[in-house]
Amino acid sequence: MAMHQFKAESKKLMDLMINSIYTNRDIFLRELISNASDACDKRYFKSLTDTSIGITKDDLKIHIQPDKEARTLTITDNGIGMTKEDLEKNLGTIAKSGSLDFKTENQSDNIDIIGQFGVGFYSAFMVAQKVTVISRAQGADTAWKWESKGVEGYTITEADKDDVGTEIILVLKDDTDSENYSEYLDDYTIANLVKKYSDYIRFPITMYREKSRQKPKPEDAGDDYKPEYETYTELETLNSMVPIWKRPKSEVKDEDYNEFYKNKFMDYSDPLRVITSRTEGTATYTALLFVPGRTPYDYYTKEYEKGLALYASGVMIMEKCADLLPDYFSFIKGVVDSEDLSLNISRETLQKDSQLKLIRNSLEKKIKNELHAMLVNDREKYETFWKSFGRQIKFGIYGDYGMHKDLLGDLLMFYSAKEQKMVTLDEYIEKMSEGQKCIYFAAGDDTDRLGKLPNAQLVLSKGYDLLLCTEDVDEFCLQMMHDYKEKEFKNINAGDLGLETEEEKKAAEETANENKDLFEEIKKALNGKVKEVKVNPTLQEHPVTLSSEGGISMEMEKVLRKMPGSGDVESTKVLELNPNHTVFAALKAAHEAGDTAKVDQYAELLYDQSLLIAGLPIEDPVAYAQLVCGLMK
């Protein structure tokens, strides 16, 4: 009998599970029951198209049998069963899931990596010193036995088993001073675990339970008769078998929803919001959806898979149906059960299924309305949600070229320079000053720096509010929207803000005409770094600022240059000088004196300063430092 070895990472994970102590090791039973339920689902699904199988849904079941004397716990199902190849494939290799890295990064946290990463069957080794799996597949003539004591490997041999299905026998570990493994042989403990973790399983989970009853009173018993009791065993169904999403809402507590969410979607935090939906008509379905309370560790990576568990008349046909959710709501978890979907539907035909599209559209509206209700009625929770998933909403607007701005626009939040807190676009508009035509915003990586920008101080001095956008996607999102409720978005560092008085405009035109040659000399000194040099009389105490023209702003340039393959993306820059500042007077004096070298030095200095103010890197920091020192002599 040959001993097969687990593969390298499988061995590490196995060792991790066997030798680590988890406060929630109870989940091993949940995992084994879930696997048994999946096997029953598969056999039932197959029976719908293969009448030779000859079973109904009522024939399928899961049975648990504890044996205190033998110290074994046996979980049996009459599901689809496994062939020798299935045993080798499913039980001989633990899929690489990143759980080792995750556990290493969270040394101090009591995190259930098994629940987090769905290692499933192997959680049995948390409580068992030996695991035996005896299985006979549907349509197979031979049964097979898989057996392992852990990291050293496993064996697969022929076995005797007449019925289709799988039997898993756990030989429990011996008790220690600190660990009581015998509790998993107690029928009360087992019943509680099934109720807690597996009550929604669709198939009956049965177990013989020891009970007590009073013996019949003898006919000749005297007045001094004392009742006598006897113990007996009775087969009991431990689970309700009604999925939580099909129960009347009045019968389900918040704690039930939270527990279902955490068990089903492998999270250790309660959801922020539970969304229930029952719809009849053109699209008949039941949905139970959740807004997670935290960002999944892989959410903003390519590895993250969106989708809802899709059931057809109670039979799961897809674990993650991506077509039920638009990308901007990809954070939503949940299940959808519809009687209108065909049981033998494939992934390919699913995409073209008209019922699925109707369900998706209905869910989209429902999710949007629930998020907006959370914004209105529970602001604190909504702001928690926004910190985790607001970026995805903004990506949704940008990625669809603004097509969904009407749907998503009133969910957006940005930091207000005036209010010093997060505000919605509706709240911004509601407090707009009389005569204000635009929604002003500044984009960058830090709210403090943005609030000190020359044009930011100008906008605020007019009594207008300013949205401080600090995420990479913010400006792209607002540019795609263009406006909100007929109020145009205006980047304070892109183009003319139009905030000058008529007198300031007239004075600026006169100054520009008087200093045309000076501006040409500055532009020449900067050698193509700016498209134009002009005066800006609204800069107050600031000598200079940098603005941009065209579709790409300076902040967008920064973002795009971080992306691979972006090439030499560059914004069109305009150098704006304050005609009322002493620096401008010094520039003008040097020009009138014919000191071209000094004008060139001032031009370089002011340009580099404007880059620093805008949060952009200067081309040559050493040359800049030398220039500053030289002008100080």
What are these regions (language model features)?
Residues 113, 134-153, 173-183, 188-633:
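GHKL/Bergerat-fold ATPase module in large chromosome/replication-associated machines
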